[in-house]
Design a protein with these regions (language model features):
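Elongated, amphipathic alpha-helical interaction scaffolds
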Residues: 1-179
Length: 180
């Protein structure tokens, strides 16, 4: 599934996309809308992003999942920042009508072949918090998650899914069966 075309084909299926999110987030998700290869233009039309897979849940959270095989070409961390910012643009109205409280919680997930942080974790989850009071979260509703197919340190179901994405073969010894 690390192949872009195969990944997008699978994510078109709402149930498959929902399963991927449920495994990564370790919580039940009810998806209402799914889009693949969705293009979001910057308001001035100068820059755009093409989301591999996007979804909205029944609790109005929005999710973007990006498969990033080559992490050497670009800074995936900064790319996640840009993606998250542009995902908010279509939701906001210009001028005095802007009401930021209507921005939905947003989860941006990058799945990479390599561990871009080099700390040997299958998943890294980031939310913004105060440097002086680390227990104080900003509460802006943004979560950025970086999963990788290199490390096997993480929840068994997550590692199994990532290993399956890395080598999509039922004979892969690093995957476990997820019974529904």
């Amino acid at each position: 599934l690390s192949d872009y075309a195969l990944c997008v084909s699978v994510m078109k299926n709402t149930k498959a996309f929902q399963n991927v999110l449920e495994i990564i987030l370790d919580e039940p998700i009810d998806l209402e809308e799914v889009k693949v290869e969705d293009v979001i233009l910057h308001s001035r039309g100068q820059r755009a992003i093409r989301l591999d897979a996007w979804a909205r849940s029944s609790d109005k959270r929005q999710f973007a999942v990006e498969m990033q095989n080559d992490t050497e070409k670009d800074d995936v961390r900064k790319r996640s920042r840009f993606y998250q910012g542009l995902m908010d643009v279509p939701i906001l109205k210009s001028g005095k009508q802007t009401q930021y409280r209507w921005l939905p919680a947003t989860v941006v997930i990058f799945i990479t072949m390599d561990d871009i942080f080099g700390m040997d974790r299958a998943m890294y989850t980031f939310t913004e918090c105060c440097r002086e009071l680390p227990e104080l979260e900003l509460g802006d509703g943004v979560t950025k998650i970086f999963c990788n197919m290199t490390s096997k340190n993480g929840r068994e179901e997550l590692v199994s899914m990532l290993q399956y994405m890395k080598r999509t073969d039922l004979k892969n010894p690093d995957i476990t069966d997820r019974s529904d």
